[in-house]
Amino acid sequence: MRRFNLRSLRFGSDSEAWRSLPVETAPFVFGGVEYVVPGGVVELELDAARVDDQLTLKAHLETEIEGPCQRCLGDARVPVEASGIDYVRHGDSEGAEFDDDEDEAPEGYARGFVLDVERWVRDLIGEALPLQIVCREDCAGLCPTCGADLNEDPGHTHEE
């Protein structure tokens, strides 16, 4: 799912609605290296509250990112949890269409009643990524001289 029609939300008597949305997620390039969400799909939990002419949208996701460790190049799998809020006023960008070729991202993630869930998920994950993706916190990395994995041979040395 790339986009979600907000009109499909069914609000209860408390003017709130909830949906779980499967969102396809493209690979991320981080530090010149590609990282993926296992299975390529993230479950986005979407809560919506309606007050007068405004919708408050709250998004939450929990997933993992996998790819090479940035220290030893072994396999790394990092948990990612992220939340965000967006607001939609009735009439804002009413009838406006998304332009996938826009140079600048629009403010917010909704145009009229269409929510760009793919872009919101990408932004949430990107903002929640750690500064360095590692296989484990104490990863020793690679030998700067020969490239040996120092996790496999912690006593690794070179004759001088």
Please state what every model-predicted region is.
Residues M1-E160:
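Structured interface patches
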